[in-house]
UniProtKB/Swiss-Prot annotation:
Name of protein: Putative neurotoxin-G
Lineage: Eukaryota, Metazoa, Ecdysozoa, Arthropoda, Chelicerata
KW Chloroplast (keyword) present: no
Main location: secreted
Tissues in which the UniProt entry reports expression: Expressed by the venom gland.
Alphabetized GO MF terms: ion channel regulator activity; toxin activity
Compartments where located: Secreted
Disulfide bond sites: 25-45, 32-54, 36-56
Domain of life of the organism encoding this protein: Eukaryota
UniProt keyword terms in alphabetical order: Disulfide bond, Ion channel impairing toxin, Neurotoxin, Secreted, Signal, Toxin
Organism annotation: Lychas mucronatus
Signal peptide (UniProt feature, chain positions): 1-19
Length: 64
């Protein structure tokens, strides 16, 4: 019983996370870029049609 409740809770949490990522990656990913910019990172949307997951990555510029 405990395992079933745990799995259900994890599924509900993960579906909420994916819904938030879809919102961030709609409209060309501008919300993802803005969201990640708060942490001085670059927002990249990827997944099916480029709108399933917003990922914040650190941008390192090479110095010449």
């Amino acid at each position: 019983m405990f395992a079933m409740v745990t799995v259900t809770v994890l599924l509900l949490i993960s579906s909420g996370i994916f819904c938030e990522n879809e919102k961030l990656c709609s409209n060309g990913g501008t919300k993802c870029t803005h969201h990640c910019g708060k942490n001085n990172t670059v927002g990249i949307c990827h997944g099916q049609n480029g709108n399933l997951k917003c990922e914040c990555v650190e941008y390192k510029r090479k110095m010449f």
